[in-house]
């Protein structure tokens, strides 16, 4: 499945909002890990890497940020805001910039955490030279 960005349905009722993510419909892999980013200083950046094996689905639960994606044709910029979801397959360069002060995103991962970061390419020049063409 290629990179995808889409809005989730937001249900508003009696003073709150509910946003469901149906795993069977929105996540094309078995979820092995969930993590989230909160309390970022306004303007913070995170990510800026690709994975060799890991696939991820990101959900912007609150706030906004800029998603920087390279799916094989150079960097693209996407606004990522409350209620948006994004599927990032392996070998797609990704990161988030300009997080708002209230930004919170949740990530659903196909792999368990590995502290040695052997599944990462964090050098964009190396990514462009060696890995960009491997996108499924």
What is each PLM-predicted segment?
Residues 84-86, 90-95:
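Histidine-centered metal-chelating micro-motifs
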Residues 1-82, 86, 102, 108-136:
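Non-catalytic, conserved peripheral segments adjacent to functional cores
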């Amino acid at each position: 499945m290629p990179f995808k960005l889409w809005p989730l349905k937001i249900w508003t009722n009696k003073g709150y909002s509910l946003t469901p993510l149906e795993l069977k419909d929105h996540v094309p892999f078995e979820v092995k890990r969930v993590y989230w980013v909160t309390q970022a200083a306004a303007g913070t950046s995170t990510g800026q890497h690709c994975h060799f094996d890991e696939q991820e689905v990101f959900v912007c639960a609150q706030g906004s940020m800029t998603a920087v994606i390279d799916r094989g044709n150079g960097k693209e910029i996407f606004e990522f805001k409350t209620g948006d979801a994004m599927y990032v397959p392996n070998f797609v360069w990704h990161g988030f910039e300009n997080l708002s002060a209230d930004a919170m995103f949740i990530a659903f991962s196909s792999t368990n955490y590995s502290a040695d970061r052997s599944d990462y390419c964090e050098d964009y020049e190396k990514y462009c030279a060696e890995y960009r063409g491997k996108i499924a």
